[in-house]
Amino acid sequence: MKQITFAPRNHLLTNTNTWTPDSQWLVFDVRPSGASFTGETIERVNIHTGEVEVIYRASQGAHVGVVTVHPKSDKYVFIHGPENPDETWHYDFHHRRGVIAKGGKVSNLDAMDITAPYTPGALRGGSHVHVFSPDGERVSFTYNDHVMHQLDSALDLRNVGVAAPFGPVNVQKQHPREYSGSHWCVLVSKTTPTPQPGSDEINRAYEEGWVGNHALAFIGDTLSPKGEKVPELFIVELPQDEAGWKAAGDAPLSGTETTLPAPPRGVGQRRLTFTHHR
């Protein structure tokens, strides 16, 4: 074991996918305090020489962090907070986006449209902890929704989503904080504010992980028959082609003014564990 960074600041590794494909570099973000999201750079360090490179530097008062690496190429994805934050719009669970950096160029991963009627393929809030699939084609993330947060913060439930390579998604901006993105984004989990005790319903989906290239496992918070929170493991199988990603089910992919975005047709989570019986 050896120390490879020495600067008097916090160097934070994401909990997955921090090695470059050649196994020579580790990527990290830098924060004055480990508990705050106030870093301005995404960096990497060579594990042999200790050389540090800045991959991206934020501007206009924005902050960045939680970086992961593409499995096959020199490409990085990370959280980007809002530029020019103010009292009405600053970094929060529902005010952040994914950004991809490659070859010195950056682009928004997810689009955001918070003005009805909402744009299919765009999100309406903030994405978080972006992770490439093993083949590098898709990106998973967790999500919180601005529209539902404005309606009632209790309805802004954490969910799991996927960015698929079927963009770009161009938003006709009607709000200064809206933006377009490179990928088609949808939610793949389904939550409810009031799960039925003892059922498979959940009010929170999080900590997802890839199972091959076409499925995600995640933790969902259920209620036991006694009404106690019990985190359980779920799995969801994903569409195989562009048509599948863009096909709406019983509810709109982009959501409504009173409902969250819905998964594509045929995409449904399945419960794997039943630990509340213990």
Language-model features, listed with the residues they occupy:
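Sequence signature of WD/YWTD-type beta-propeller architectures
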Residues: M1-R278
